[in-house]
Design a protein with these regions (language model features):
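N-terminal helicase ATP-binding lobe
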Residues: 1-352
């Protein structure tokens, strides 16, 4: 109906400020009354640069930033401002000797986190590898648990603040997460005053995160998620949509002879396809790209030319880029991965 007034009123009352902001940007008619103008002014008070939190996010952030406990847990849905909170916390505790470490579970998350932190804290020395440490008095380390553990074990340094991303991994019993538990213990051994902040979307009870040296954990939880995903299932050439309220699948009209045809029929301007293993991913990507025509585009030609020049002529992804398809996995060199990721985000012709 294009009538956003009910959604606008609901969002104002429940503090869903990003929704209010979006509606006001696209419907100036809602700024006709004095009350609506006042709402706009009040909401803008919560904005920091380009980031606008919900009221629940804002309140949780303030609680975390003012909490003096040495162990804090922030439980919130994925993509709900965790990186923003980490940056705000670092800015608050920042000093000339600050040593902080952000621990990410995989190498693939290193550069993503680095770009965000570097943009917000450009004046700080940032380490991405334990070998980058050269005796600095102050730094922000963005590391995997393996690299952080090597840094503490082999170098004369310690952390004042430790930010654990995907903290629920502590519950797993594999080697990587045993290393994470060792890292937390060693951080406290080397600096008893080390403050640890745990971030996760999945922790049921934060007391389960207790490791050596932890008495109580302050927990802050985001209960209301304004972003609800829609789930579709493709099976036996048919597609269904999942209703989370009735826990039931409803079959949709139409038939699709292959999964590739289903994807192509429902594609948007940008589409992220997740495959579980690098070897399998490359095979699936090649088969998928075979469904697409070659693109005639100066932008695509320029990307291909650059890859041939800086990687090699027979690089497998060249034939895929011609069709607007790229892939990313942890075994790609970082400089290639960063370039491909940037071009995929900024080139309209690359849809998959």
């Amino acid at each position: 109906t294009s009538d956003y007034k009910p959604l606008y009123d609901f969002s104002v009352n429940y503090g869903f400020f990003p929704i209010v902001d979006y509606i006001l940007e696209h419907d100036e008619n809602l700024l006709q009354s004095v009350a609506d103008v006042i709402n706009k002014v009040n909401i803008d008070k919560y904005r920091t640069e380009s980031f606008l939190p919900t009221i629940q996010q804002h309140n949780a952030y303030e609680c975390v930033l003012n909490d003096e406990n040495s162990d804090i847990s922030f439980v919130a849905p994925t993509s709900f401002g965790k990186s923003e909170l980490i940056v705000r916390h670092i800015k608050k505790v920042n000093n000339l000797t600050l040593k902080a470490a952000i621990i990410v579970p995989t190498k693939s998350l290193l550069m993503q986190t680095y770009k965000y932190v570097k943009a917000q804290l450009a004046d700080k020395k940032i380490l991405l590898h334990d070998q980058m440490y050269t005796g600095e008095e102050s730094y922000i380390a963005i590391l995997t648990q393996e690299r952080a553990l090597r840094l503490l074990e082999k170098r004369n340094t310690n952390f004042d603040y430790l930010y654990i991303d995907e903290a629920h991994n502590l519950f797993e019993k594999d080697m990587r997460n045993r290393l994470l538990a060792r890292l937390i213990r060693l951080s406290r051994v080397k600096n008893q005053k080390c403050e640890i902040l745990y971030f996760s979307p999945l922790v049921e009870t934060s007391d389960n995160l207790k490791v050596l040296g932890t008495s109580t954990i302050s927990e802050y939880r985001i209960e209301n998620n304004i972003k609800i995903p829609t789930y579709y299932l493709y099976q036996n050439k048919k597609a269904s949509i999942y209703n989370r309220y009735f826990n039931k699948l409803y079959e949709l009209p139409g038939q699709y002879p292959t999964p590739y045809r289903y994807i192509l029929s429902n594609a948007t301007d940008k589409n992220l396809l997740y495959i579980t293993a690098p070897k399998k991913m490359e095979v699936v990507t090649i088969k998928f790209a075979q469904q697409l025509p070659d693109l005639v585009s100066p932008a695509i030609d320029k990307i291909i030319s650059s890859i041939k020049r800086h990687v090699h002529n027979e690089f497998q992804m060249v034939s895929l880029i011609k069709k607007g398809v790229v892939y990313l996995h942890g075994k790609l060199p970082d400089y290639v991965k960063d370039y491909i990721e940037y071009k995929a985000a900024t080139t309209l012709e690359i849809k998959y």
